[in-house]
């Protein structure tokens, strides 16, 4: 089933990861602890808006930090400056500032627990080896972006740049984020869209596809990180590529223009291509 997600490691590891790498100037743990407690008390899920985190699967528990620093400069013209020599450094972790954002990259020398990466790899219908690669990974790199930057798209861009640079690591075999495991060359290639001033929509959002008795269905996964609702198209009479491209165009429009789709309105990308918008509980990704 396409929507069989299990993103527990992403949620459970993120807070621990941040606590270990926090920088007081950019991240106030006391303030965020209150948010977590309030959400728990209300019995609601924590708001994921602006929380960019993911994992680079590795076939061996090693990474080349110096290479990563070189790749960030070569690929994105971002100079990585670690904290000064008076502060303790960790060969397995790297924390640096980019404007008002904090980038954190850290090696974990063990697989993601409970077969979670393998389960989510099943959602990648575009990569035949996704499940096997996920099953065989032996370690992972945790990647996160946080800080005071208010423009969520800027945080998302930096996250994609970090993960794309990690794709060049010798032992990188997959990128686990947005509820799926991406092929590294796919992820890095689509991140290059940013060099043309385009949004890296295929790095941010997973466009799931599956068939039912009524036809082809498609859905987004990852819009919530940008403070937007997920979208789906149900029972479509369309080719998979057409449906995926439609959803990608729609997601790009919503994110780039900061649009909120309203129930009862119509949307389309040409005069003879109009679709009714219906707000309802999700079918592909039920609450």
For each of these PLM feature ranges, what is it?
Residues 103, 107-206:
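Internal, hydrophobic cores of structured domains that mediate oligomerization or house catalytic pockets
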Residues 1-50:
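A C-terminal-region feature
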Residues 74-82, 162-176, 252-262:
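Structural alpha-beta junctions
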Residues 180-287:
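Aromatic/basic-lined ligand-recognition segments
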Residues 59-131:
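N-terminal low-complexity, intrinsically disordered segments
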Residues 2, 51-59, 137-147, 287:
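Short, hydrophobic/proline-enriched secondary-structure or compact coil segments at domain edges
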Residues 38-72:
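N-terminal alpha-helical "arm" segments
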Residues 62-64, 147-151, 239-240:
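Short acidic, S/G/P-rich loop/turn micro-motifs used as interaction or catalytic elements
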């Amino acid at each position: 089933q396409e929507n069989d997600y299990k993103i527990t490691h992403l949620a459970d590891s993120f807070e621990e990861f941040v606590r270990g790498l926090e920088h007081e100037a950019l991240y106030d743990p006391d303030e965020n602890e209150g948010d977590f407690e309030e959400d728990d008390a209300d019995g609601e899920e924590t708001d994921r808006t602006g929380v960019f985190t993911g994992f680079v699967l590795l076939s061996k528990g090693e990474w080349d930090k110096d290479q990563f620093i070189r790749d960030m400069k070569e690929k994105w013209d971002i100079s990585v400056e670690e904290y000064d020599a008076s502060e303790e450094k960790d060969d397995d972790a790297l924390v640096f500032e980019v404007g008002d954002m904090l980038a954190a990259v850290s090696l974990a020398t063990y697989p993601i627990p409970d077969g979670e990466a393998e389960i989510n790899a099943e959602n990648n219908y575009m990569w035949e080896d996704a499940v096997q690669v996920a099953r065989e990974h032996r370690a992972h790199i945790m990647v996160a972006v946080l800080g005071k930057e208010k423009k969520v798209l800027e945080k998302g861009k930096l996250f994609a740049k970090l993960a794309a640079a990690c794709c060049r690591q010798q032992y990188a075999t997959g990128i686990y984020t947005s509820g799926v495991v991406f092929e590294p060359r796919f992820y890095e290639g689509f991140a290059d869209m940013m060099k043309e001033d385009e949004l890296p929509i295929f790095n941010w959002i997973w466009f799931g596809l599956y068939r039912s008795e009524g036809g082809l269905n498609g859905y987004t996964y990852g819009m919530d990180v940008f403070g937007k609702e997920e979208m789906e198209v149900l029972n479509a009479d369309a080719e998979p590529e057409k449906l995926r491209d439609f959803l990608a165009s729609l997601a790009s429009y919503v994110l780039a223009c900061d649009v909120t789709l309203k129930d009862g309105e119509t949307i389309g990308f040409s005069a003879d291509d109009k679709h009714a918008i219906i707000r309802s509980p999700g079918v592909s990704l039920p609450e």
